């Protein structure tokens, strides 16, 4: 999709673009924020058992676990 410099457009072209955008937006299905928040919360809660950020990563499968041992020179 080409980049359009709005400053180079005529007023008629700007208004046409605005009308086109509004036509697209009017067809969008809208939902109440409260309903969406409930659905997102339910989705997260259903999958929280599988989420490594919630339940953690088992030590044997943690790729970032610090290696044991080493040498300290004083």
Curated annotation (Swiss-Prot):
Please report which positions carry a covalently bound lipid of kind S-farnesyl cysteine: 71
GO MF terms, alphabetically ordered? G-protein beta-subunit binding; GTPase activity
Could you name the domain of life of the organism this protein comes from? Eukaryota
Q: Where Cysteine methyl ester occurs, residue numbers?
A: 71
Name one matching Pfam family: G-gamma
* Any one of the GO CC terms: photoreceptor inner segment
Q: Where in or outside the cell is it found?
A: Cell membrane
Q: Which CDD domains match?
A: GGL
Name a biological process GO annotation. phototransduction
Write out the propeptide range(s).
Answer: 72-74
Query: What keywords are annotated for this sequence in UniProt?
Result: Cell membrane, Lipoprotein, Membrane, Methylation, Prenylation, Transducer
On tissue specificity, the annotation reads: Retinal rod outer segment.
The topology of this chain with respect to the membrane is: Lipid-anchor
- Subunit notes for this chain? G proteins are composed of 3 units, alpha, beta and gamma.
| Protein family according to the UniProt entry | Belongs to the G protein gamma family.
The UniProt function text for this chain reads:
Guanine nucleotide-binding proteins (G proteins) are involved as a modulator or transducer in various transmembrane signaling systems. The beta and gamma chains are required for the GTPase activity, for replacement of GDP by GTP, and for G protein-effector interaction.
Q: What is this protein called?
A: Guanine nucleotide-binding protein G(T) subunit gamma-T1
Identify the taxonomic lineage of the organism of origin. Eukaryota, Metazoa, Chordata, Craniata, Vertebrata
Which gene holds the coding sequence for this protein? Answer: GNGT1
């Amino acid at each position: 999709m080409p980049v359009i410099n709005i400053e180079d457009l005529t007023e008629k072209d700007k208004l046409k673009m605005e009308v086109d955008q509004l036509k697209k937006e009017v067809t969008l299905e809208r939902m109440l924020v409260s309903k969406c928040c409930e659905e997102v919360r339910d989705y997260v809660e259903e999958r929280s058992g599988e989420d490594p950020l919630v339940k953690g990563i088992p030590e044997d499968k943690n790729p970032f676990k610090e290696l044991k041992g080493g040498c300290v020179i004083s």
